[in-house]
A protein has these predicted regions:
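Active-site core segments that coordinate phosphate-bearing ligands/cofactors
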Residues: 3, 9-146, 151-199
Length: 199
C-alpha cells in the first residue's frame, strides 16, 4: 500500500482510494492493494521446494536475493511474459475475486529473469493504477515516497521496480523489510505513550 499525507489538499472521495487519518487527525489517501507479492511468494516457495528436493540447504533471504537481482537482467518488457497476480479480489481494479494467471505466447522470451521480472512488475501494478488516480486525476503532489515491506528486503530491486511503475523516486529505510508490522508497532507505541502524556 501507499499512503500519502494530504496537507491542505482537497480530494474527491473515490471508492478505489481509502481515506484514513493519522493518530493526530491528518488526512491520508491510501492506495491499498490486496495482493502485491502474494503470487510471487508462492512461486518463490516452489523454487524453495525444488531446492529442498535436491538436498540443497535453503536460505530464503538468499533465494529472494538471487531471484530478485536476476530479474533485473531480464528484458524491460519482461520478454512478453504477463503475470496476473490476483490471489484475492482487488477494489482498486474492481475485481471481487482473484485467480492468479501467468500468460505467455510461444514466441515470448521465456526464461527465469523475465519470469521473475514479470512477477515483480505485477506485484506493483495495482499500486501504479491507484497512484495514477492520485497523481494524474487528483493532481496530488508528493515530497517523497518511502517503500517498506518484504519487497524491499533485497537492496535496490523493489525500490527500482516501484520507482519505474509510479515514475517517482522511492526512498527505503534500513527497517524496510519489517513492513507493516513495524508501522503497527510504532503506531501502538504512539498511542500508548500519547495516552500517558495526556493523563
Amino acid at each position: 500500500e501507499i499512503s500519502l499525507g494530504l496537507v491542505g489538499s482537497e480530494m474527491c472521495i473515490r471508492d478505489r482510494i481509502d481515506m484514513v487519518t493519522t493518530p493526530d487527525g491528518s488526512l491520508v489517501a491510501m492506495v491499498h492493494c490486496n495482493n502485491c507479492t502474494s503470487d510471487l511468494n508462492a512461486w518463490v516457495n516452489l523454487f524453495k521446494e525444488y531446492q529442498e528436493l535436491l538436498g540443497i540447504p535453503v536460505d530464503m533471504d538468499e533465494i529472494y536475493g538471487k531471484l530478485y537481482n536476476h530479474a533485473l537482467t531480464g528484458n524491460t518488457d519482461c520478454g512478453g511474459l504477463i503475470s496476473y497476480n490476483y490471489i484475492s479480489g482487488e477494489p482498486v481494479t474492481g475485481l471481487a475475486e482473484g485467480r492468479p494467471l501467468f500468460v505467455r505466447s510461444a514466441n515470448d522470451k521465456f526464461n527465469l529473469a523475465n519470469f521473475m521480472r514479470a512477477h515483480l512488475h505485477a506485484s506493483v501494478g495495482v499500486l501504479k493504477i491507484g497512484n495514477d488516480i492520485l497523481f494524474k486525476e487528483e493532481k496530488i503532489k508528493v515530497d517523497r515516497i518511502t517503500g517498506h515491506g518484504g519487497l524491499f528486503r533485497t537492496k535496490g530491486v523493489g525500490q527500482r521496480i516501484l520507482a519505474a511503475a509510479i515514475n517517482s523516486p522511492i526512498s527505503v529505510m534500513e527497517t524496510a523489510g519489517e513492513g507493516g508490522a513495524w508501522g503497527i508497532a510504532l503506531l501502538g507505541s504512539y498511542l500508548v505513550n500519547n495516552d500517558k502524556q495526556q493523563n
